[in-house]
Amino acid sequence: MKKVTMNLPEIKDYRLTEGLNQLKTNLAFCGKDIKVITMTSSVPNEGKSSVSFDLSKTMAEGGKKILMVDADLRKSVLAAKYHIQGIDKGLSHYLTGQAEIEDIIYETETEGFYLTVAGPLSPDPTSLLDSEQFQKFIDKVRDDYDYVIIDAPPLGVVIDAVIIGKYCDGAVLVIEQG
């Protein structure tokens, strides 16, 4: 498995740390069958990608094996935001038959934290996410990880998060503070 490097900013706000710990605990209380979680928001720029990333990292630091999947195939910000280096294939490569599952999962510098990025923009992201190939991906990673955190597009913009949600065990709606 390939390893990526990235800029991992330290979480300095105790309120964010406490919120992530509460979310992590609440997910654990949902039961062992709740493993694949969609993270979305109602509109862009509410912080869902940051919460998805920070939650995944926090859970991994707590001893869980976590896969974070960037499924925002239209407007992904993850790779650029965290300056991720060493990635050559993403989810869209797998969904279009250009890569195998093992080619799109990367180990991070945090033990237990694995990552799949969105990959290049596709002409029809909705069809890719509503495909048998995406179902196969979810079925495979569900068995291999303690939790799969899927960063989905905002609900109020495109239908993709609803489609992704049908393959998941639960959803978290992130809203901007204030």
Where do the model's predicted regions map?
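Active-site signature of alpha/beta-hydrolase-fold catalytic machinery across serine-
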Residues: 54, 58, 81
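Conserved Switch II/interswitch segment of TRAFAC-class P-loop GTPases
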Residues: 152-157, 168-178
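Hydrophobic anchor at the start of a short beta-strand
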Residues: 66, 148, 171
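P-loop/Walker-type NTP enzyme "switch/lid" segment
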Residues: 2-17, 21, 25-26, 30-32, ...
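Primarily NTPase-proximal linker/entry elements flanking Walker-type ATP/GTP-binding cores
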Residues: 30-36, 57, 61
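Alpha-helix C-terminal capping segments
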Residues: 58-62, 163-167
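Hydrophobic positions on the alpha1 helix immediately C-terminal to the Walker A/P-loop
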Residues: 50-51, 55, 160
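Conserved beta-strand segments of the P-loop GTPase G domain that flank and frequently precede/overlap
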Residues: 38-40, 117-118, 150-151, 173-176
